Design a protein with these regions (language model features):
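Nucleotide-activated sugar donor-binding and catalytic core shared by glycosyltransferases
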Residues: 1-164, 169
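Positively charged, low-complexity/disordered segments
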Residues: 165-167, 171-182
Length: 182
């Protein structure tokens, strides 16, 4: 099974899904394809689509995949690399209004240069043949980088949660002090 994930950005990722359709036509792919399409307005009869998945279901799709075609979100990429999968990553591009900036290109380049993934940012059709013989570098990655990033993201989320809690508390105090009804 080939698992495709485009993430959950509000603007969808049509370019990636259209390229998957082109892959099927050009390379005669008959393997089952399941695509998590998020908010993308897209219909096809060439493969199975699902809008969203929970975390456990998402990881199960990755585990069962022979290949993962992914947007360049760090969570999707790191989960796929950690699972030892062959990954083709397509960064969302600012020039196509897929993202506010081009930060995903940097992540794809770093991971591709390191031998963890294949860069398919500009063309999945051109990236597909690179899968043959590709052995993803992953042992050192899953042992060192992922736990560090997990800790960093968890700490940031905890700090952000405390900040927002404090903003709500202060906002309530200000509203109650300055209310004309008190």
């Amino acid at each position: 099974m080939i698992f495709v994930t485009v993430g959950t950005q509000p603007n969808g990722f049509l370019r990636c899904l259209q390229e998957v359709e082109m892959l099927i036509g050009k390379y005669g792919i008959t393997e089952e394809i399941v695509a998590q399409i998020g908010n993308t307005d897209f219909e096809t009869n060439k493969f199975t689509t699902i809008r969203f998945t929970g975390e456990n279901e998402f990881k199960k799709y990755i585990k069962n995949a022979s290949v993962v075609i992914s947007h360049a979100g760090s969570g999707a990429l790191f989960n796929s690399i950690k699972a030892g999968k062959k990954v083709i990553a397509m960064a969302r591009l600012h020039e196509f209004n897929e993202m506010a900036d081009n930060h995903q290109i940097e992540l794809v380049k770093k991971l591709s240069d390191g031998g963890y993934i294949i860069d398919g940012t500009y063309s999945l059709v051109e990236a597909w043949p690179k899968l043959e013989g590709f052995v993803p570098r992953n042992n050192d990655f899953k042992c060192e980088i992922v736990p560090v990033l997990d800790r960093w993201i968890s700490a940031w989320m905890e700090q952000e949660g405390r900040r927002r809690s404090e903003e709500r508390r202060v906002g309530k105090e200000c509203r109650s002090r300055w209310s004309p009804y008190h």
